[in-house]
Amino acid sequence: MNPNQKIITIGSVSLGLVILSIILHVVSIIVTVLVLSNTGTGLNCNGTIIKEYNETVRVERITQWYNTNIIEYIGRPSNEYYMNNTESLCEAQGFAPFSKDNGIRIGSRGHVFVIREPFVSCSPLECRTFFLTQGSLLNDKHSNGTVKDRSPYRTLMSVEVGQSPNVYQARFEAVAWSATACHDGKKWMTVGVTGPDAQAVAVVHYGGVPVDVINSWAGDILRTQESSCTCIKGDCYWVMTDGPANRQAQYRIFKAKDGRIIGQNDINFNGGHIEECSCYPNEGKVECVCRDNWTGTNRPILVISPNLSYTVGYLCAGIPTDTPRGEDSQFTGSCTSPLGSQGYGVKGFGFRQGNDVWVGRTISKTSRSGFEILKIKNGWTQNSKDQIQKQVIVDNLNWSGYSGSFTLPVELTKKGCLVPCFWVEMIRGKPEEVTIWTSSSSIVMCGVDNKVANWSWHDGAILPFDIDKM
């Protein structure tokens, strides 16, 4: 075959393949039209299939139009209603573990923040652990000196409850060295206190956006709860202190809606001292159990009504629950006055159950070690010493720290009452241990209908870390 014949043959074959391809495409179109015309209303040219995927960072709506996908990013749907939170507390027979973050153990080899003052608060959909970071990581040189309470590096951040305070899952909330946070059913509200001691400012964030501020009115370390604030029917309440930690200070209740302050009221408490209140909703009011850092080894009690009227006094029970404290047998109890001369103190909590009260305290009378919760019959209203239940959470061979309260809303549990819960901070490092840093992890417990065995859910990290040996 000469070259011309080869060219003609190749051209003929190519032309034949092109014609065959055109025929196949025509047949494909005819078959598709015939099939679609026989499917009735099941599929039509104007029909679409829409699928929505609720991802962590966005909601995707994927529209499938036969063999074509159109991806559209849409806004995350917001909750429509405020939480009620006017129900009574559920009766608790014991407290079961809800979560434990093991942050310090994980932080020996993971990217975990140096923190203090962790606390838990819940929305209708989830509970989150909030914490004050030191702007540094465990086992890193910047963790040196983090025993200090107030610095420009401290921030309020949060993770889903049970997660360690790690850099990959933490969400920024506010610049703060003192804070509170709560959810009204629609959005999170946070209050972060920062700035110099004499001119500190509290910034109120709502839905992640700063919307209001509170300036220091006494010029002496404006500070707040270090635990969950309380929202009832869309109004959120919290307590702040401004003034000395070891003598008479000034105390105020604040009320906000959608992050904007709509009311405040001074608390008249001459001779008494209020710090770091642990508050919860109960029967339409806010009940708080606080810290007396001046003289009392009994805890201040504050009950707030929606109109910002209040009653204030001390937990009546004849058993002291602050630290340091004296012997139980030597304590008489008072509903109106501070008792004891120990000074100092530690953040704590309690829950009213009718006239009875559940109260938490360190097991040690002199240091922040061990933790137990007691139920005292008639302890809310009388100087009762009648301990009807006790549960150990951390044994006295291990460090504890702050503790505080929160509740599980009925929207989350589908119960007709608010489940009482608490958290216990377990402080590690300075000043009790030979490290360059101070941080903490936490255990979280919630009320159940059964008694729960004693155990020790302690921190468990083996110290010192590598950074402490350099």
From Swiss-Prot:
- Where does the record place the region Involved in apical transport and lipid raft association? 11-32
Assembly, in brief, is:
Homotetramer.
Gene encoding this chain? NA
Catalysis: reaction(s): Hydrolysis of alpha-(2->3)-, alpha-(2->6)-, alpha-(2->8)- glycosidic linkages of terminal sialic acid residues in oligosaccharides, glycoproteins, glycolipids, colominic acid and synthetic substrates
**Topology in the lipid bilayer:** Single-pass type II membrane protein
**Listed transmembrane segments:** 15-35
Residues reported in the UniProt entry to bind substrate? R116, R150, E275, E276, R291, R368
What is the protein's name according to its record? Neuraminidase
Listed cofactors: Ca(2+)
Write out the residues that bind Ca(2+).
D292, G296, D322
- GO MF, any single term: exo-alpha-sialidase activity
User: According to its UniProt entry, what is the function of this protein?
Assistant: Catalyzes the removal of terminal sialic acid residues from viral and cellular glycoconjugates. Cleaves off the terminal sialic acids on the glycosylated HA during virus budding to facilitate virus release. Additionally helps virus spread through the circulation by further removing sialic acids from the cell surface. These cleavages prevent self-aggregation and ensure the efficient spread of the progeny virus from cell to cell. Otherwise, infection would be limited to one round of replication.
Provenance organism: Influenza A virus (strain A/Equine/Algiers/1972 H3N8)
Q: Where in the cell is it found?
A: Virion membrane; Host apical cell membrane
Protein family membership: Belongs to the glycosyl hydrolase 34 family.
Post-translation changes: N-glycosylated.
For this record, the Gene Ontology CC terms, alphabetical, are: host cell plasma membrane; membrane; virion membrane
Free-text activity regulation comment from the record? Inhibited by the neuraminidase inhibitors zanamivir (Relenza) and oseltamivir (Tamiflu). These drugs interfere with the release of progeny virus from infected cells and are effective against all influenza strains. Resistance to neuraminidase inhibitors is quite rare.
| Region called Hypervariable stalk region, residue ranges | 32-86
- Mapped to this chain, the residue ranges on the Virion surface side of the membrane are 36-470
Keyword Glycoprotein belongs to the record: yes
Q: Which residues lie on this side of the membrane: Intravirion?
A: 1-14
Q: Where is the active site?
A: D149 (proton donor/acceptor), Y402 (nucleophile)
Instruction: Supply the InterPro entries for this chain.
Output: Glyco_hydro_34 (IPR001860), Sialidase_sf (IPR036278)
Renumbered to this chain, region (Head of neuraminidase) spans: 89-470
State the Gene Ontology BP annotations. Answer: carbohydrate metabolic process; viral budding from plasma membrane
